[in-house]
């Protein structure tokens, strides 16, 4: 009725093997490529797991900071990553050109290897989600003010980012929207409602 369990069944190595076996047996998305699984679990784009994304070659600072970051983290375990980055940036600036030279040479070698391995490579940075939504909202809520010359486009204040007196048309401040006006503003009716209002003199 009771099963005697061997102490080895709970060792970390056995547990890790059991987890891996379970994952392979029960997951449709499982691949033996660990980096693809890590990307999906850490919020990366899971669609890219089939086609691995090509990383940029490391520059001289990154080559140098790789080992330095490890050293600083071991010496100061309580230090935040952002603080470590600031310290590394300062330390890099303090190095002489002669001290930096081996890292520039290594970066050049890595760039050449990268160019040979990926001849058609072109760096294409991913646009951050927040940045993309801000651009879309600016386009959506931009309108021509009544006193503006034809073609002048002035963005409306969105979420309090523009402060009163800091948006100008023809040298005159544009009246910021009240909370009530902002609620009434929709993409379909925003421009016509705004054109009906005279600008302050």
UniProtKB/Swiss-Prot annotation:
> How is the polypeptide modified once translated?
Acetylation of Lys-130 contributes to its nuclear localization and enhances its interaction with KPNB1. Deacetylated by HDAC3.
What residues form the membrane-spanning segments?
Answer: none
The record places the DNA-binding region at 54-122
Transferase in keyword set: no
Query: In Gene Ontology terms, what is one molecular function of this protein?
Result: RNA polymerase II cis-regulatory region sequence-specific DNA binding
State the superkingdom: Eukaryota
Cross-referenced Gene3D superfamilies? High mobility group box domain
| Function comment | Transcriptional regulator that controls a genetic switch in male development. It is necessary and sufficient for initiating male sex determination by directing the development of supporting cell precursors (pre-Sertoli cells) as Sertoli rather than granulosa cells. Involved in different aspects of gene regulation including promoter activation or repression. Binds to the DNA consensus sequence 5'-[AT]AACAA[AT]-3'. SRY HMG box recognizes DNA by partial intercalation in the minor groove and promotes DNA bending. Also involved in pre-mRNA splicing.
Name of the featured protein: Sex-determining region Y protein
Gene it is expressed from: SRY
């Amino acid at each position: 009725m009771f099963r005697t369990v061997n102490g080895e069944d709970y060792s970390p190595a056995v547990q890790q093997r059991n987890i891996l076996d379970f994952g392979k047996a029960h997951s449709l998305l499982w691949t033996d490529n660990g980096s693809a699984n890590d990307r999906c679990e850490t919020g990366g784009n899971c669609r890219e797991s089939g086609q691995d994304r090509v990383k940029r070659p490391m520059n001289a600072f990154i080559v140098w900071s790789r080992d330095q970051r490890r050293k600083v983290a071991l010496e100061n375990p309580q230090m935040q990553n952002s603080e470590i980055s600031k310290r590394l940036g300062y330390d890099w600036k303090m190095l002489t050109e002669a001290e930096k030279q081996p890292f520039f040479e290594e970066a050049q070698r890595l760039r050449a290897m990268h160019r040979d391995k990926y001849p058609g490579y072109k760096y294409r940075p991913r646009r951050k989600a927040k940045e993309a939504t801000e651009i879309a909202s600016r386009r959506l809520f931009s309108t021509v003010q009544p006193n503006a010359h034809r073609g002048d486009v002035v963005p409306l204040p969105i979420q309090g980012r523009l402060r009163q007196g800091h948006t100008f048309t023809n040298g005159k401040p544009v009246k910021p929207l009240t909370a009530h006006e902002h609620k009434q503003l929709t993409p379909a009716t925003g421009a016509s409602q705004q054109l009906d209002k005279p600008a302050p003199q």
